[in-house]
Amino acid sequence: HCPDPETEPDAFWNGEEFLAYLKKTTLKPLAPNYENWYAYYHLGILEFRKGNDKIAKEMYETSLKLQENAWALHGLACLSIHEGNKNLAALYAQRGMELKRHCLSYQKEGLKILSQCEAYRAILQQYAVMDEDMKSIGRVQYYYALGLVKTGRLEEADKLLNSEEGIVVDDVREGEDSIQDLWEILNHELYGGKQILPFRYEFHAN
């Protein structure tokens, strides 16, 4: 199975038996998957989950050599974060985002990785080249506002958060108050803490 890199990967198989089978059918020169980018990507995922970072990196890199793909780049970004190399992780994430420019889920994941890397200028650069529909997504707007705040563009962030529409994030996780945190930073820096937090940003109100 060697899908087009443009398509999202299938659900992954797990388990030692499948890993052994995949190695057997992939790693030797005459193996049927020897030049299959997807097989090496899959091996990278499985090895990373087992904590075999070095082998996972080799698998992801081989996948990329065979066929540049956003999925192995994402794997390398996650691996680089795990190893504490935020600068490299941010580079991998940005290249992946370039390849999947019109895939909302990939773009949101890329912005998340960039925020974990504290690559706030990169967040702003990626946001700038998104289409207008994608820019209107609440989760995307949150990362944009984060980038604005962290790069000192407080007035622009304030205009976004305190606009009539505000930022509406439909996929807020339980216990997540990151938009509230941003608003409180702006309130402190721009208004001396005198503003009242809008109810829409009180994610623990209920």
Regions found by a protein language model. Give the residues of each.
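Eukaryotic alpha-helical solenoid repeat scaffolds
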Residues: 1-25, 132-206
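Hydrophobic/aromatic packing residues within the alpha-helices of TPR/SEL1-like helical repeat arrays
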Residues: 26-27, 60, 93, 127, ...
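Short coil turns that delineate tetratricopeptide repeat
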Residues: 34, 67-68, 101, 134-135, ...
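Alpha-solenoid helical repeat scaffolds
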Residues: 38-42, 71-76, 105-110, 138-143, ...
